[in-house]
């Protein structure tokens, strides 16, 4: 009888640890929705709207006016998946080589260190879903320009002051 009592607390302790592990993760579950912010986006510009993030991934929507684009760059510690939600986006690689023109619900996967840039090529405002994955615990993604920036950094909506500070410290715009 003493042995059974001795084994039982060990099992309970293991089960309790497992349950605490799951409860901690589940306490971080968040719902989100994309709502276009009521802001005017200057011609040929774009903004980012943060949807959600963890310490190993982030999702945001970039909103681009017609002609809105960025410069050739890469991310040494981030894999990217993009999908067009509205409008048309053309992605380019080095030498302005077209990687494809994408419409609604089409997209592209860009592994870390892939050099790319993109531009809104449709007649309407474009909404581009960005899903970024990076090493667990990374403070921020890195953005390394290959060519000079065409403008200053994009406006980010929905980020905390700390997230914005870290982003400024870790990103180069050319």
Regions found by a protein language model. Name each.
Residues 95-112:
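Short acidic-glycine-tyrosine-enriched beta hairpin
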Residues 62-65, 74-91, 131-134:
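Short, conserved beta-strand element in jelly-roll/cupin
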Residues 118-122:
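Asparagine-centered strand-capping/turn motif at beta-strand->loop junctions
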Residues 55-56, 77, 96, 123-124:
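Short strand-connecting beta-turns/loops that link adjacent beta-strands
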Residues 1-58, 71-72, 143-174:
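A short, N-terminal "cap"/entry segment at the start of jelly-roll beta-barrel domains
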Residues 81, 109, 123-142:
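A short hydrophobic beta-strand segment most commonly corresponding to one strand
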